């Protein structure tokens, strides 16, 4: 469920960032680079963006050739994490159905001369199969957390968020910090996850007077994975918190432009555009033709909305947390977001809307 929620919230960030859905098309992943997890994540996000008027509004002619890696390469990164977890699951299922006792007793063993010959002291108890896949998952967790934090950072940074307010707060005098501390928090958690990703399985310390001279430390690895997965959920919750704010701004900005265009003639609309040429300039006529075309297009456009699953997830967020129009205490809201992730409420809302 945590992986599916990561895909859903990545889709919300794509909407807020004005990213494209074309990199999520199934033929790119199933046909050309068919890693199973990659195809699943791409399909999850493409479905979450279905029906998005925001995505459709800038599909052509926005001048963006390639999105940043944290948007364009989500299926490849999320998918690799999925495949790591899938491998761990395969090993766990084998272990759950395996015999790991010691010694092992084989009554009637062919060639056995006595009862002692029917008893084999083997090594099925050794935890290395589990330890190594836990190390694999430990390495994957900060990878997923890191790309989530990078998307969050893009949404709050005015240099990269494509016109959204700095730190997603509407003041222009710089007196409010908005979602700045949310990014600080995510960065701190990601750093902590990265420092804990070092594999315990590569450090064997002999026990039992060297009778057990090579051990897996698998229990430590499993405990680390449990704790780290909880912190990964916190990073995903912080991205949801931020992406919901960004998406509200994005919707309002696009719809405000539509309303502005429908309520003004071309000359009035042109007067509100920074850097517009004067009436005596040589390129004024061409500029006005472009303004008229823009006005007509915006005036006829329907209200811009995100994809249906993303919109449902956003509505679920808003049932618990209001849009932030001014700085306020955020600790309680962050905890509510963590609880929403833990209980899977946003994912259930999104799936019901598909």
Question: What is each residue range found by the language model?
Answer:
Residues 1-354:
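C-terminal auxiliary extensions adjacent to catalytic cores
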């Amino acid at each position: 469920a945590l992986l599916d929620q990561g895909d859903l919230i990545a889709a919300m960030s794509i909407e807020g960032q004005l990213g494209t859905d074309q990199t999520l098309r199934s033929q790119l992943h199933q046909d050309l680079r068919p890693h199973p997890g990659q195809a699943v994540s791409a399909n999850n996000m493409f479905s979450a963006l279905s029906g998005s008027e925001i995505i459709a509004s800038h599909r052509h002619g926005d001048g963006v050739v390639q999105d940043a890696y944290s948007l364009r390469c989500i299926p490849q990164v999320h998918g690799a994490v999925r495949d790591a977890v899938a491998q761990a699951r395969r090993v766990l299922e084998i272990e759950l159905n395996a015999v790991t006792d010691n010694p092992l007793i084989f009554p009637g063993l062919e060639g056995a001369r006595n009862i002692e010959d029917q008893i084999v002291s083997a090594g099925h108890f050794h935890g290395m199969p589990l330890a190594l896949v836990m190390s694999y998952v430990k390495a994957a967790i900060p990878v997923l957390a890191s790309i989530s934090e990078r998307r969050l950072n893009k949404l709050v940074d005015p240099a990269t968020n494509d016109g959204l307010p700095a730190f997603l707060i509407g003041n222009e005098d710089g007196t409010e910090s908005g979602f700045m501390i949310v990014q600080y928090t995510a960065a701190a958690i990601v750093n902590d996850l990265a420092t804990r990703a070092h594999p315990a399985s590569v450090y064997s310390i002999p026990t039992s007077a060297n009778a057990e001279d090579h051990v897996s430390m698998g229990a430590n690895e499993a405990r680390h994975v449990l704790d780290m997965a909880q912190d990964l959920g916190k990073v995903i919750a912080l991205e949801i918190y931020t992406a919901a704010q960004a998406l509200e701004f994005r919707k309002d900005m696009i719809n405000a432009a539509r309303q502005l265009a429908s309520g003004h003639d071309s000359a009035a609309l042109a007067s509100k555009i920074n850097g517009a040429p004067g009436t005596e300039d040589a390129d004024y006529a061409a500029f006005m033709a472009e303004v008229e075309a823009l006005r007509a297009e915006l005036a006829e456009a329907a209200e811009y909305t995100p994809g249906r699953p993303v919109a449902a997830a956003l509505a679920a967020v808003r049932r618990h947390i209001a849009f932030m129009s001014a700085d306020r205490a955020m600790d309680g809201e962050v905890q509510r977001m963590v609880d929403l992730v833990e209980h899977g409420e946003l994912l259930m809302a999104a799936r019901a809307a598909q």
